Amino acid sequence: MFTYQIKIEYLVTNFVGWQRQKNNLSIQEVLEKVLSKRLKEKITIIGSGRTDAGVHATEQSAHFKTKQHIDDKNTFINSVNFFLNKYPISILSIKKRPKGFHARYSAIKRTYKYFIINRRSSLVIEKNKAWHIRKKINEIGRASCRERV
């Protein structure tokens, strides 16, 4: 068996989050279906964390095991992304990892970004990607938030 780490980008707006759930579509479920189809074997994918509904990812790490050695990584990524094209999910990179690698337990750090847009007008471009606060936020509160996050 070979272990591969992938980096993924996705929007969770129309999903229940990362983790597979009965009767609801998740990022994990879509990736497992597409990878299983591409590799012609049942694939289980493990994420470095589990994002909730409404939480997007720009470089989520995950891993899967397969019987196949993936020689041409660019062709593999392109073919998987072709099948992912109807979803807001994309594989950014893939790396072969040693036996024992685990996306969650081998992670050294995690980075989170929180976007707050403070204005009266409704959000259009950033809708579902930021927390919209219509009331004016004071400067002291803003500085305090920067240091805590």
What do these predicted ranges mean?
Residues 1-148:
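Structured-RNA-binding interfaces characteristic of tRNA pseudouridine synthases
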